[in-house]
């Protein structure tokens, strides 16, 4: 059983716990997920089953959309409501225009400092474990992009907004930084992932709904590898190219049934009659001894025949 399942993660569960539940519900050991959600958060969690775990690296590259709520005037050690309050300030002087100006200033690319309470590791140890021991270590800021930030409600001290951001962005740090810029502190109180790559929360299914389904019906929820990678350009491979792929050899451009009209370096999905064959990078200029006009990134056993 191979495929992608879009789960609406409930509040209070870790992403790892969701994966464990899916393992039991589908009777599979090989299950993984793309893009961790904190226990506080809900919404889109992309779960891969079987051979589909091989495409997680491509799904993790995509941008995300979140709906977040914050409260002004209180700073916590975790930057969210699950932490301890470490500072307070009266936000009574904050008006809607000040909030709008600060939120507008957040749009763009900048270096974001990851919080100590995160799954990032220092010398193999997760930062959150060090933080719980009262240890703070230096972290390297990471380049992130906020493509859009739309205010939905401004009722100080409570603010709700939607944010479209690049992978690896910490939304609770956005909330913390908004509080810093407003001069009163802030922390995240609610977070829902509305979209991850092409996957919208409207197509997500709850764990409760999966449990209520008959076991034999659950595979109907799965997206194929080709469907999950639908945002990548796809190329149909001729039988000769499919045979080469079976030996791990990339096809040449003349083994592609479609017109290749994109730039060198583009990541593409190679497909056959039955679905996905491989993810590859188009590199027509590579040395001839490398064989083929593509560099294979991942090969699947999905699409060689109908």
From Swiss-Prot:
InterPro entries: PsdUridine_synth_cat_dom_sf, PsdUridine_synth_N, tRNA_psdUridine_synth_TruB, TruB_C. The active site is at residue 38. One of its GO terms (molecular function) is tRNA pseudouridine(55) synthase activity. GO terms for biological process: mRNA pseudouridine synthesis; tRNA pseudouridine synthesis. It comes from the Bacteria. Keywords: Isomerase, tRNA processing. It catalyses: uridine(55) in tRNA = pseudouridine(55) in tRNA. Belongs to the pseudouridine synthase TruB family. Type 1 subfamily. Responsible for synthesis of pseudouridine from uracil-55 in the psi GC loop of transfer RNAs. This is tRNA pseudouridine synthase B. The gene is truB.
């Amino acid at each position: 059983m191979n495929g992608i399942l879009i789960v609406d993660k409930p509040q209070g569960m870790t992403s790892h716990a969701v994966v464990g539940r899916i393992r039991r519900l589908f009777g599979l050991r090989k299950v993984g997920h793309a893009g961790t959600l904190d226990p506080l958060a809900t919404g889109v969690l992309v779960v891969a089953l079987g051979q589909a775990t091989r495409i997680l690296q491509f799904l993790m590259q995509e941008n995300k959309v979140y709906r977040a709520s914050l409260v002004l005037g209180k700073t916590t050690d975790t930057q969210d409501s699950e932490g301890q309050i470490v500072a307070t300030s009266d936000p009574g002087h904050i008006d809607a225009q000040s909030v709008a100006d600060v939120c507008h200033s957040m749009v763009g690319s900048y270096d974001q400092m990851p919080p100590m309470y995160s799954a990032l590791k220092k010398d193999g140890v997760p930062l959150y474990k060090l933080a719980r021991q009262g240890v703070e270590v230096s972290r390297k800021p990471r380049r992130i992009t906020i493509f859009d930030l739309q205010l939905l409600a401004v009722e100080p001290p409570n603010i709700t907004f939607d944010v479209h951001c690049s992978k690896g962005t910490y939304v609770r740090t956005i909330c913390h930084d908004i509080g810093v810029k407003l001069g009163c502190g802030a922390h995240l109180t609610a977070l829902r992932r509305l979209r991850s790559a092409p996957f919208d929360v409207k197509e997500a299914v709850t764990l409760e709904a999966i449990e209520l389904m008959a076991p034999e019906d659950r595979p109907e929820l799965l997206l194929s590898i080709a469907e999950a990678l639908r945002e990548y350009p796809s190329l149909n491979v001729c039988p000769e190219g499919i045979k080469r792929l079976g030996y791990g050899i990339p096809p040449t451009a003349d083994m592609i049934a479609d017109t290749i009209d994109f730039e060198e370096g583009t990541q593409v999905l190679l497909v056959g009659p039955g679905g996905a064959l491989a993810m590859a990078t188009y590199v027509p200029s590579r040395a001839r001894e490398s064989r083929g006009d593509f560099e294979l990134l991942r090969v699947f056993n999905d699409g060689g025949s109908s």
